[in-house]
């Protein structure tokens, strides 16, 4: 990870700020759809700061610059930021939030500028209130100043073809999904829903794209009313098959006309009020993640209602076809990972091959690509050896990465997009003799992963409540990890999917776990400069039978679908309970039963799998 000299970029940005009478300028990570993962053309925060992580906000004043990010990226940011930048570590008590730091720069009635398409309406209101206390004000600038600094070197916006996602994998037609959405909107007396999140649009219309790396989505907006369905998309992205799929039930409109139409909808709603209609006017709904600019186009906070997206809620509860697809693709994916780990061990120990982290991950992609229904990777593979494994979201660069050390911990976090599902698996291995500390750390993390997997809890329980199940064994030793325990996973969609998850984020306390949710289970431990441990399975929430049923409500548990062995060499059986040993042995028996058939003619992998799945 190289440090980028940002001095000239900051100087140019400050000149533009001065011209526009802006004292502080905000550069969020997200695009105009509030996507976590973005297209290269939207990488403004990375361009101005040099920090390439997926989360964070850059704040630039006329004399200072700060970058705020969460615990996943503290190590990475400290390496990538040059001396122009102060790192604000989110969640650390001694550190101000980026909003507080911004307010500190504003004495004397200064102005904070931001592109209103890159910040949510609720965040804009909250920030405005914070900076008002320091005498400052928030100004939305329609032209993005970082884009002006970037100039002709900024990548162009992708315009790749959209494809139909077959109903055999989707499990429900797009017409049924729109009908369900309309019923939900009618219950809440809404005039309609303006859809801005890209994965929600892809899911709703049973379409997939390729505009953002690793995420099968496409740039679009949609407006759904009781009688109309409008899709705002560049028409050259649509094939004849896609147009036939949508038929006459969906009106196609230019992507750029969304704000003009939103403004017209807002004015139409106001006209109804002025006309003296007897019933209260129905408001349009937008997601709480919709942009400030979209809210303003519809008339502002008094004219629209910001809600947790009903599409997000529906999408998170997978139907039977999606759940079956998840089971199937994880078996194939687990077989690919097993083949890769067997190959890697053989290359390092028997052939004494010198491999770097990227060469190894390239081999994994090659193996995966041969699996049925493979489309591509679901995120950049984290292939990390030794101290690099302590960088939670490490990215090995092709011309600047480490040789894999057989005598050090190797952490591999990887996933793929298949037509029938999305995978995300982490395994930590050791090809030599691990230290006692490495074995203890691994086993404590494993115990936490098993605790989530085997949890039984009443309906209505949130991921916030479950988080301590995973951390308890580390906490007893005074250890912890600075990331969430689990995130929602899409079905041939984004590998990080809301609104559910397991962790300490406020949002995880708001939405309970429901049957049909697909979530990662991935506790970890990281010792900077030395090693990192993470173990990740994908689990699916389901109703379970219990001896009793207190409160006469359903009880839930999890079904794991990830099928690749855990690391025997790093596991210390003396730290495991009898129940945990039984779980590991049963899990490994399941892995053998479901994946060994892939290796009937592959003796190397079959022998490795048999060895790794023996009872402990």
Swiss-Prot record:
UniProt entry tagged with the keyword ATP-binding: no
UniProt binding sites for Mn(2+) 2: 413, 424, 536
Matching Pfam families: Creatinase_N, Creatinase_N_2, Peptidase_M24, Peptidase_M24_C
EC nos: 3.4.11.9
Statement: the UniProt record of this protein carries the keyword Zinc: no
PANTHER family, sorted: XAA-PRO AMINOPEPTIDASE 1
UniProt-recorded name of the protein: Probable Xaa-Pro aminopeptidase P
Native source organism of the sequence: Paracoccidioides lutzii (strain ATCC MYA-826 / Pb01) (Paracoccidioides brasiliensis)
Gene for this chain: AMPP
């Amino acid at each position: 990870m190289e440090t980028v000299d940002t001095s000239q970029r900051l100087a140019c940005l400050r000149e533009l700020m001065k011209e526009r009478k802006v004292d502080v300028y905000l550069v969020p990570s997200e695009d105009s759809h509030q996507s976590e993962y973005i297209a290269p053309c939207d990488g403004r925060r990375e361009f101005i700061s040099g920090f390439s992580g997926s989360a964070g906000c850059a704040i630039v004043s006329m004399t200072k610059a700060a970058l705020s990010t969460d615990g996943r990226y503290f190590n990475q940011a400290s390496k990538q930021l040059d001396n122009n930048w102060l790192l604000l570590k989110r969640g650390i008590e001694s550190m101000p939030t980026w909003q507080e730091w911004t307010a500190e720069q504003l004495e004397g009635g200064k102005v904070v500028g931001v592109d209103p398409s890159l910040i949510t309406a609720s965040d804009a209101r909250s920030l405005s209130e914070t900076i008002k206390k320091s005498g400052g004000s928030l100004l939305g600038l329609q032209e993005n100043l970082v884009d002006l600094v970037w100039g002709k070197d900024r990548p162009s916006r992708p315009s790749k073809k959209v494809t139909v996602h077959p109903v055999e994998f989707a499990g429900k037609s797009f017409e049924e999904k729109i009908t369900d959405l309309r019923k939900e909107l009618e219950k809440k007396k809404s005039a309609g829903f303006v859809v801005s999140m890209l994965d929600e649009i892809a899911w709703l219309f049973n379409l997939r794209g390729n505009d953002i790396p690793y995420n099968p989505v496409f740039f679009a907006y949609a407006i759904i009313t009781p009688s109309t369905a409008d899709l705002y998309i560049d028409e050259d992205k649509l094939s004849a098959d896609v147009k036939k799929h949508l038929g006459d039930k969906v009106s196609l409109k230019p992507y750029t006309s969304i704000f003009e139409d939103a403004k017209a909808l807002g004015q139409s709603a106001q006209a109804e009020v002025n006309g003296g209609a007897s019933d209260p006017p129905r408001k349009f709904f937008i997601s709480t993640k919709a942009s400030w600019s979209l809210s303003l186009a519809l008339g502002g906070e008094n004219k629209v209602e910001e809600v947790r997206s009903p599409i997000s809620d529906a999408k998170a509860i997978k139907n039977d076809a999606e759940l079956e697809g998840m089971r199937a693709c994880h078996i194939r994916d687990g077989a690919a990972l097993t083949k890769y780990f067997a190959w890697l061990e053989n290359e390092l120990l028997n052939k004494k091959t010198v491999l770097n982290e990227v060469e190894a991950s390239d081999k994994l992609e090659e193996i995966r690509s041969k699996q049925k229904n493979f489309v591509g990777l679901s995120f950049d593979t984290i292939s990390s050896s030794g101290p690099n494994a302590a960088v939670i979201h490490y990215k090995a660069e092709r011309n600047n990465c480490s040789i894999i050390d057989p005598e050090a911990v190797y952490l591999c976090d990887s996933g793929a997009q298949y037509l029938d599902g999305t995978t995300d698996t982490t395994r930590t291995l050791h090809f030599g003799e691990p230290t006692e500390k490495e074995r203890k750390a691994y086993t404590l993390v494993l115990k936490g992963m098993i605790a989530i997997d085997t949890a039984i809890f009443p309906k209505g329980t949130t991921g916030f409540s479950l988080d301590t199940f995973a951390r308890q064994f580390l906490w007893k030793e005074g250890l912890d990890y600075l990331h969430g325990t689990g995130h929602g996973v899409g079905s041939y969609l984004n590998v990080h999917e809301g609104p559910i998850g397991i962790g300490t984020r406020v949002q995880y306390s708001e939405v309970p776990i429901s049957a049909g949710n697909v979530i990662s289970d991935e506790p970890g431990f990281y010792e900077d400069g030395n090693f990192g441990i993470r173990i990740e399975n994908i689990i699916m929430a389901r109703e379970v039978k219990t001896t009793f049923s207190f409160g006469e409500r359903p009880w839930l548990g999890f079904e794991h679908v990830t099928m690749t062995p855990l690391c025997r060499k790093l596991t210390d059986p003396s730290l495991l309970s009898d129940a945990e040993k039984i779980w590991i042995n049963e899990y490994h028996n399941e892995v053998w039963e479901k994946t060994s058939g892939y290796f009937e003619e592959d003796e190397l992998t079959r022998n490795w799998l048999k060895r790794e799945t023996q009872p402990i």
